[in-house]
Every structure is written in structure tokens, then in C-alpha cells.
């Protein structure tokens, strides 16, 4: 009887292994997994896939993740009249497109020798018309093992890549101030990134890389009124400006909740460390003030960004956190990284406490496992780091806890000078 039970278990295991090892077809949509990685003005990624593909110097790269080595027979679901080159590493295939309608076009077989992200490049060689054609899907047949890529998920969010966060543990009691230091390493400096240093339950405060000619220090507070349109907020629930720093722009924002926004155009530099100081204090009348200060390391002075009043709110500092995100879907193939160090909290009584514990979390893009290029952790010099994008292979599980040694000394702040800003 016992032998029969063991035999049944072995047969079941063999059946599961056989089913799991069955070759599969992986259909990778270009609209969610493709990028123009060279000469971006010569092709576009749209809901139809690769379109407006006119420049032979443009390269379109398609990414997907495989969990084990395998061979794969590649095809394209494409249309057009042209010759294109399809490359995997050093192996290239010349492919002729000869159809006005979308059809499956064989490419060739590749040998994928290790688990991780696979990159397939497309480049135009010659064309009979204005365009090299349109590519809707990359198809990989006879693949063994599991795969991950943007599928049954928003192309927009999938192409942006996963946002990653660090939540810091506060001491007991009421916290009024949060202090954090941020450094963007040269290798992590990527346009359209938000390196957020001092987040809180009702908003955030950090640095952005907006364009080749513009960088910002951004501070935003959400309204207590839940809407995506700031024009819908009733007057008694609007964020009110109390103080404004020199050269700081004040406005509204929407699409992810609505509220008050402020930013200072400031040419922060990769490799330099900048200080962020955030105050949250109830006013005793059912409202709370939020005040953000930025230490301009290059000028060696504190700057006031803004002070806002949030109505119908009675809170001290809650949920201090940092995050890293890419806000351009065209840039999701590039990696970005940031270091955070020397975190301190100051109680309403004026006592500083060194914060040493952080918890790593991520957004829905990572939770859905459509992107696996997300990380957080410790640096060798006792700081925390966040990294995302660029299709690297090593990810960190949601909820992983990190610890840094309680080194450093409490921030030296001239409180009276801050009040005069």
C-alpha cells in the first residue's frame, strides 16, 4: 500500500515535470515591451507597435524575461516592404517583409544560454517606400520555462518600469521634522527621473531631472478632497500657500490625486549630496502646515521651497519615505539609481533621533511581475539605495527590511534663520 502511494507520487511528479517542460510560445507585444533605443526620432512605439519607422540608424529593442536557458525560434508579426536586421547579441538575421497585411514572418533560431532578460534588436536595412513597415509582436516558439513581460497590463505603466520605495521607521511619539540626504550617482542619472527624498502621508519632496536643460526641486501636498481634477476641489479643502521661496513656482497638479505643487528650477549635479528638511505641524485649528527646505550644496545655503496649509487635517509627520520613479514611458529601458543617507527625525519636543530601519516596497508594475528590474538595499558606506529600470536581472522581494548603523551626528540647523527665509 505504501509502495503504491510512493509510485503515484512519482508518476504525478513526472507528469508535472513533463507538462512544465513542454515547449511554449511567447508572444511579446511591442507596444508594451519595445523601445526606440537609438535615433529616437526615426521610429515610434505606439499601440500598434513599431510605427513611423523611417530612419535606418534607428534601433528598436524588445525585452522579455526567461527563467531558464532555452532555444527559441523567433518570428515577427509584421507588415511592410523592406529588408530589416534582427539581432540577438552578436547573432543577426536579415528578414524580408513582403506584405501589406500583418503576417507571421520567420526570423531564425537563437540559443539563450542563461536565465534573465533577453533583448532583441530591430534595424532597417532597405525599404521600397517611406517606412520600413510596422512590427506588432515578437514571437518566440519552442521556449521552455516561465517568462515575464508586459502582458494583460497597461503598456504605459509597463514601459515606464517599476517605481521603488523605502519606508523609514519612526521612534515613538510625535515627529515634527524629517531630515534626509540624497545623492544621485553618475551612473544613476537618467532624464525623466524623480528622486524623491522626503515623502510623507500627504505628499512628497525631492529632485527631478526634467529635460537636458532643466532640473527641479519639487514639493507637493495632496488636497484632502479626493479628485484627479484640481478644479473640482471645494474652496474649504484647497491647499493654501503660506510662504514661498525665492524663484519658486507655485501651481496645482492632478492625475494622481490633486493639490498644491511648488518647484524651484535648480541645476543639481550627479555625485553631489543634497539635504532635505521637511516639517509637518498641526496648527491647533483642524489644519496642518507643511514646510519644505532644501540645502543647496553648490551654494552652501538653505532655501525655502514653500509652506502649505492643508485643511481638515490634524497630523504630525507620518510615513516618512523615499522613492525612485521614471515618469517617461520612452525611457523605461534606461536604469536609474539613487542613494539616501543620514536620516533623522526630530520630535515636537525638539529631540533628534537617528533613523536606522527601512522597508523596501514597490508599485503595481512590480507586483504584477510584468517588470523584474527593481532593487533596494544598503551601500558599502552605510547608506540605503534604490535602483530600477534598464532590465537588469537581480530583484529584491517586496517587504525586505534593511538596516544602517546609527552613525553621524544630528543635523546642525539654525532654526531662526529658516524662519526668515
Q: Whereabouts are the PLM-identified features?
A:
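Extracytoplasmic
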Residues: 22-267, 275-282, 286-421
